Amino acid sequence: MLTFNFKKYDLNKEGSMLDVGCGEGRHIFGVMQEFPMMKCIGLDMDNDSLQKAEEGYAYFESISDAGAEFMKGSAYSLPFSDNTFDLIVCSEVLEHLHEYNDAVIEINRVLKPGGKFYASVPASW
């Protein structure tokens, strides 16, 4: 189940997407289905989740023209240049970070001007 309905937003359909805390890749795979020309990158700290995302990608790879990749990394130090992504998703992650403001600043650094940042947190947070 996706946290966001990407079809209802005005997205650059041939742009690039970063999922910070991608887990097993559900948002990556959702974007690949809706926007097959969008390059997707999933970043997570958990090796097991990244392995499952790679396994899932084998199933979804044929529906995307731009592809996806998964990598280990931290929301505090994103390994990308400034102004790289048209869309950044961070779903159910910020509440786990002690310095979530620092992560949001880092996310803003790699988001292109006019890009979209979608975050979700539990209602109790």
What are these regions (language model features)?
Residues 6-9, 15-125:
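Conserved SAM-binding loop
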Residues 1-3:
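Conserved SAM-binding loop and adjacent beta-strand
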